[in-house]
Every structure is written in structure tokens, then in C-alpha cells.
Design a protein with these regions (language model features):
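Beta-strand scaffold of nucleotide-dependent catalytic cores
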Residues: 177, 183-190, 196-204, 212-214, ...
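Active-site nucleotide/adenylate-binding loops and adjacent lid/helix of ATP-dependent enzymes
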Residues: 75-185, 193-194
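Short, surface-exposed beta-strand-loop junctions and turns on beta-sheet-rich folds
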Residues: 134, 205, 300-302
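A long amphipathic alpha-helix within ATP-dependent nucleotide-binding catalytic cores
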Residues: 168, 172-178, 204-288
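Conserved N-proximal alpha/beta basic substrate-recognition cap immediately N-terminal to
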Residues: 2-122, 268
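Short acidic-glycine loop/turn motifs at beta-strand connectors
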Residues: 144, 191-195, 226-228, 288-290
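Short catalytic/ligand-binding loop motif for oxyanion handling, primarily in non-cytosolic enzymes
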Residues: 135-138, 209-210, 304
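C-terminal active-site "lid" helix and adjoining low-complexity regulatory extension at the edge
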Residues: 13, 242-266, 273-280, 287-335
Length: 335
């Protein structure tokens, strides 16, 4: 499935209901908003969620044209992260093996029932995940008791193409922010010709109810100062609700200092050079009491989190990568 198809496969009925709510808030008719969506789609290739999340109904044409949508991601990532090398990242067991020095936890992808039983004995709390997936779908936290017999779990893994990994015990300071989920930092890097740099970083925090911090699974995001490792401003969820403090813990976001930030930066800058063909990666970094670890690497990271938090389009991120590629390869890629 192409990303553009993915963007527009959403529920049109739900989009219409969302427009009805927005109509009252903005004082515009549903017809006016929908025709505006069609205009924005023609100009940018945006999907339903893009239109709402980025408040396209409020943007000038100049502002609109700076937003990265699914359309731009498809084009850009074929240059910066070609599909020919995707399984290095997208098949999650491959990722765990390829970046084993950075993941900091046990995982089980293949073996015998007896080996699975031994794994479960060593890991009384596990995460069960699909071999591939987007936006945190299909991820579940499970105790040893909930997992049932090793034989039954083994058969389920084989049938549904699942793998399991040991649950990450997160750093005490991060746990203070939200203990219901493992809260991660999304760091996008550009690795090219033996050099790497950080393009942006933001924190993702669970809502205190779900076991997942993903923006698409009820989590929220907060801007992060790359130099200091401090959060700044407010947190925002996908419904654009704003939070000065975490709704469950009451901890203030602005000024919250991440532990092991320098170590985290070094880790992702090193990891960015592991595969010389994949230049742009969105790393999900967790913190334990011993330091940072990689949860996963996304070969084609989305722009929704950074653009919602920035409240503006971020084509500048893509342009900075294309400038380096053009200079080195004599190409003339433009966005």
C-alpha cells in the first residue's frame, strides 16, 4: 500500500463528523471546509488527518506549501531511504539483530518451544509485536501469566508473525513523568558519506492510560531542545489537546530535563551510519537507569509530530538533506 493511499483510506464519515464540529468552532460551513480540503489536497496531497492536525483551514497559501505531507514523504524517501533496503528496518526482528549493540534487551524471534519457555522465565514482563507495523498498531504489554503456555504463545507467534522482547524498565526520572508506558524520544537523523547529524527531536509520552506512548495511540508529544535535552513549551496530543502538566502525574513538561542526553545523541549518531543506504531514520530512544537504548528505527519517519509541535511546515528538514545529496552526487533534487 502506498503512503498516499494510506492517507486517504480513513473513514470519510468520521472526517465529515469532524468537519461538523470544526464548523461550529470556526464559524464556517461544512461545505466551505470540505471544498477547502479538496483545494489543500490538490496543492499538497494531504490526507484527512493532515488537514485537521495541521489546521490547514487556517493557513495561508505560503504557509500551506511548507508542510510535508504523505505525497512529499513518498518522493523524498525514495531518494533518502530507498525501498530496496527497507527490510533492514521494517522487519522488526531484523532491526533487533542489526542494532543488537544498542537495543539493550533480550528478544525472541525464532527457536524452539523450550527456548521460548526459558525466555519467558527470564522475562516475566514482555512486549509482543508484529514483525512489521505502523504507528504502534498491534503492540501489547503482557505478563508471564497472561502469555499462557509457551506452546500456545509459540503457535500464536508463528500464525500471526509476531515476536517478543523483554519489557524495558525505564529510568526513574522518566517514570516519574508517566509510569504507565515506556516514554521515548523520537530523534530523526541524517547519515551520509560517513557523517551524521540530528535533524530534530521530540519526546513522546503516554497519556497515563494506554501502555503505548505513540502519537497515534493516544500519546502526546513535547518539543525538545537538542542542545540541552530539556523539554520546552506544552505537550500536545493528536486531537490537539494541550497540556502544561501531565494529566496523570501532574509533572510539568516545560523545563523537564532528560537523563543521559549526551549519551543518547552519540548513540543515534553512531547508529545512523550502520546502513550506508538508508540516510534518514527516526529513532525511538528509551532511557533506563543504565543509559539510553533503541526501541526501534523507522526508515521513513512521519512529520506529524514535529509539524504539530512546531505549528508550521517543516520542509526545511528535507531541504537540508537534499542539499547535501545534491552537492555530493551532482543531482538537482528540489522540494
Amino acid at each position: 500500500m502506498g503512503l498516499l493511499t494510506y492517507a486517504l483510506q480513513g473513514n470519510l464519515g468520521k472526517f465529515h463528523r469532524d468537519l461538523k464540529v470544526l464548523s461550529k468552532k470556526e464559524g464556517r460551513s461544512v461545505f466551505s471546509l470540505f471544498t477547502n480540503f479538496l483545494y489543500c489536497f490538490a496543492k499538497t496531497g494531504c490526507g484527512y488527518s493532515d488537514y485537521l492536525n495541521y489546521k490547514f483551514y487556517k493557513r495561508t497559501k505560503k504557509e500551506l506549501m511548507e508542510y510535508v505531507t504523505i505525497k512529499h514523504q513518498e518522493w523524498f524517501y525514495e531518494i533518502a531511504s530507498p525501498s530496496a533496503y527497507k527490510t533492514f528496518f521494517t522487519v522488526k526482528p531484523n532491526f533487533m539483530k542489526n542494532f543488537s549493540q544498542y537495543v539493550g534487551r533480550e528478544f525472541f524471534t525464532e527457536g524452539t518451544v523450550e527456548e521460548l519457555e526459558a525466555f519467558l522465565e527470564r522475562n516475566p514482563l514482555i512486549m509482543i509485536k508484529p514483525y512489521d507495523g505502523l504507528a504502534g498498531h498491534g503492540v501489547a504489554k503482557m505478563t508471564r501469566e497472561e502469555a499462557g503456555s509457551a506452546q500456545a504463545l509459540y503457535e500464536k507467534m508463528q500464525k500471526e508473525h509476531l515476536f517478543i522482547e523483554g519489557y524495558v524498565k525505564q529510568n526513574a526520572e522518566i517514570n516519574r513523568l508517566c509510569s504507565a508506558s515506556v516514554n521515548t524520544i523520537r530523534i530523526m537523523t541524517f547519515g551520509y558519506k560517513g557523517k551524521s547529524r540530528i535533524l530534530y527531536a521530540a519526546m513522546r509520552i503516554g497519556n497515563g492510560v494506554n501502555h503505548c506512548d505513540n502519537f497515534h495511540q493516544g500519546g502526546m508529544g513535547c518539543s525538545l531542545d537538542i542542545e540541552t535535552g530539556k523539554l520546552y513549551g506544552i505537550a500536545i496530543d493528536k486531537d490537539l489537546n494541550e497540556f502544561e502538566v501531565h494529566p496523570s502525574s501532574g509533572v510539568k513538561f516545560d523545563g523537564f530535563q532528560l537523563p543521559y542526553w549526551e549519551e543518547a545523541k552519540k548513540m543515534v549518531l553512531d547508529a545512523a551510519l550502520v546502513n550506508e543506504h538508508i540516510h534518514v531514520v527516526g529513532w525511538d530512544v528509551a532511557f533506563t537507569d543504565e543509559g539510553p537504548i533503541l526501541i526501534e528505527g523507522n526508515r521513513r519517519p512521519g512529520y506529524d509530530l514535529v509539524q504539530v509541535l512546531s505549528d508550521c511546515g517543516r520542509k526545511d528538514i528535507m531541504r537540508s538533506c537534499l542539499e547535501d545529496i545534491n552537492a555530493a552526487e551532482g543531482t538537482n533534487y528540489k522540494l
